Amino acid sequence: MKKRALVSVSDKTGVVEFVKGLLEQGIEVISTGGTKKLLEENGLQVIGISEVTGFPEIMDGRVKTLHPNIHGGLLAVRDNETHVAQMNELGMEPIDFVIVNLYPFKETIAKPDVTFADAIENIDIGGPTMIRSAAKNHKFVSVIVDPVDYDVVLAELKVNGEVKEETKRKLAAKVFRHTAAYDALISNYLTEQMGEESPETLTVTFEKKQDLRYGENPHQTATFYKAPFAVTSSVAYAEQLHGKELSYNNINDADAALSIVKEFTEPAVVAVKHMNPCGVGVGTDIHEAYTRAYEADPVSIFGGIIAANREIDKATAEKLHEIFLEIIIAPSFSKEALEVLQSKKNLRLLTVNIEKATSASKKLTSVQGGLLVQEEDTLSLDESTISIPTKREPSEQEWKDLKLAWKVVKHVKSNAIVLAKDDMTIGVGAGQMNRVGSAKIAITQAGEKAQGSALASDAFFPMPDTLEEAAKAGITAIIQPGGSIRDEDSIKVADTYGIAMVFTGVRHFKH
């Protein structure tokens, strides 16, 4: 019996050449609407879907393939005598190949001016039904949803006269991934339209960006997936201009660096190691900002990741060139800067649109057996809600240092303490099990620079021991959430030493 293929695609990439190949193999081709028109315009002989169904395409194409003559031909088990007898009795013929991809729902809702009606009209019904039917019966039906698979199928047909069973199974698995992702986009769109924050089920879809050499450690496998819609200010959608491919750890660190540098509107540079900032500097230009970020911790910056929120110029590039770095991320690089930095063949240079999100996106964290979902912590300091419980208020310079430290501390692993002075961090205490331990690390790192500096804490002081350490180091201003039952003890210590202290009322834990 002559084999038949059904072709109906929205993405017409390579379809003319593929159908030509099918016809050359003696396969009869059925097609619909715009696909049929394109094939005929290219001189290919195809059969209209209405000739198979005996029913016209109706309702603006909404109903054309939803017919027993199509789905019977797709779902019939060819070695089941009952199925074959029923097909013969009803005048049905088997369909052996399905080449279908779906209405461009993703592309439609990505348009800034999309209407709800446009989105709904681009929900495909017949396409998913056909490819699911074909994939279920993949022992007998080859189903292709991705133009990248056209050559594989044609090659096997030319060599073997048929598609290998293993290939059919792989194609079927791809179909169900394809429809699952498609339905996830639709369900998420409708859920967002209804303003539902915590639906009873959560379906997410990501697209493979690249395989990674390994994960956090060489014995772990890893892959990088990106969100289906371009998050322009992200590592996933950054453009790599130079250097080795990104590693798992590179991606994590680059993401952390980007998150911090987005906090600043003035020229800023952030240096990150193991997802914690080791140096942050701001200045009148990017060269000055980098100089301060470097001076914040000239030891830890070695082998680090740098993020800048302004173009890298030649002078800054020459300073960056002096030390070993893994990655430099910036909105752009001047031509002269690229010439300087590209002399280091392994240095990764990324460009990305650096802008702070206007609304909090969802952050997904996997735990054993489950998934935690929360809003990203994008909350900025609201000066209208702060309080100053101490006798002394911060000076203008102290305020400047406090704000810088507060922007940084929320990106440091808890318990987190950050010291800042003169437009740069001078000490970072991260990830300790008690707050005073983190304070001691930050103070030790700052050394003599701690004198006259500002301290930020991501959470309140459960007791005044951190304040005692700060006072001994000569720290003159502190910003913290407040809210401890022992706040009064901390306030008394601050007043004793003449420290100005600000309560924000907002905690910034980071785990």
From Swiss-Prot:
One of its GO terms (molecular function) is IMP cyclohydrolase activity. GO terms for biological process: 'de novo' IMP biosynthetic process. It comes from the Bacteria. Pathway: Purine metabolism; IMP biosynthesis via de novo pathway; 5-formamido-1-(5-phospho-D-ribosyl)imidazole-4-carboxamide from 5-amino-1-(5-phospho-D-ribosyl)imidazole-4-carboxamide (10-formyl THF route): step 1/1; Purine metabolism; IMP biosynthesis via de novo pathway; IMP from 5-formamido-1-(5-phospho-D-ribosyl)imidazole-4-carboxamide: step 1/1. The keyword NAD does not apply. It catalyses: (6R)-10-formyltetrahydrofolate + 5-amino-1-(5-phospho-beta-D-ribosyl)imidazole-4-carboxamide = 5-formamido-1-(5-phospho-D-ribosyl)imidazole-4-carboxamide + (6S)-5,6,7,8-tetrahydrofolate; IMP + H2O = 5-formamido-1-(5-phospho-D-ribosyl)imidazole-4-carboxamide. The keyword Transferase applies. Its EC number is 2.1.2.3, 3.5.4.10. Residues 1-145 form the MGS-like domain. GO terms for cellular component: cytosol. Keywords: Hydrolase, Multifunctional enzyme, Purine biosynthesis, Transferase. Belongs to the PurH family. The IMP cyclohydrolase activity resides in the N-terminal region. NCBIfam families: PRK00881.1, purH. This is Bifunctional purine biosynthesis protein PurH. It comes from Bacillus cereus (strain ZK / E33L).
